[in-house]
């Protein structure tokens, strides 16, 4: 694979026709090569075809916030933007939260995502997610849905770009969340959802549709 002017990918394949059939605007070059526009949709299709392709976030995104990403965070953000539904099992302390923030911000700038719901334990709603959003996405609006039932419902309805919610009380604001236009859900400490028979999972499942982006994150997948 060769990147051309950060705009296109040139691929050498045994069967280039599978790419030209899946991506009509791609162009076959010779017998075994094809040139594809390097866009988010094209990168997703290539990965669905089993052709590993990086996300254009790697060169087309201005990494926001006070700090620049480490290489592994760029790779994580790239992975997340390629996969509409995926798991992130990076070890604790590797900056998964920042990677997810950059990835989601990129998707919003691309017009793919409008609102993000972050579901996490109460203990990290402020200390991890709110603080990191204020660090890495200062241009975005952020609300923490905590307090009385009426207050939580009002916060969800206010329309912030990111809403941070404790996983233990999704049911209290379920109707508001369903109507909230959340097209990306990030579940942190996802081991709390490993049992699909629990009420917690069944409530979350009501918010997930075919076109919903869903990223499940945990540094301890075996827990």
Q: Where in this protein do the model-derived segments appear?
A:
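Charged, low-complexity intrinsically disordered regions
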Residues: 1-54, 110
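SF2 helicase/translocase NTPase motor core
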Residues: 17-30, 52-78, 82-85, 94-212
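Contiguous N-terminal and early-domain "leader" segments and peripheral loops that mark the onset or edge
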Residues: 34-36, 189, 216-217
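A broadly tuned preference for mixed-charge, low-complexity surface segments
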Residues: 49-56, 218-222
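Conserved helicase ATPase motor motifs in RecA-like P-loop NTPase domains
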Residues: 91-93, 211-223
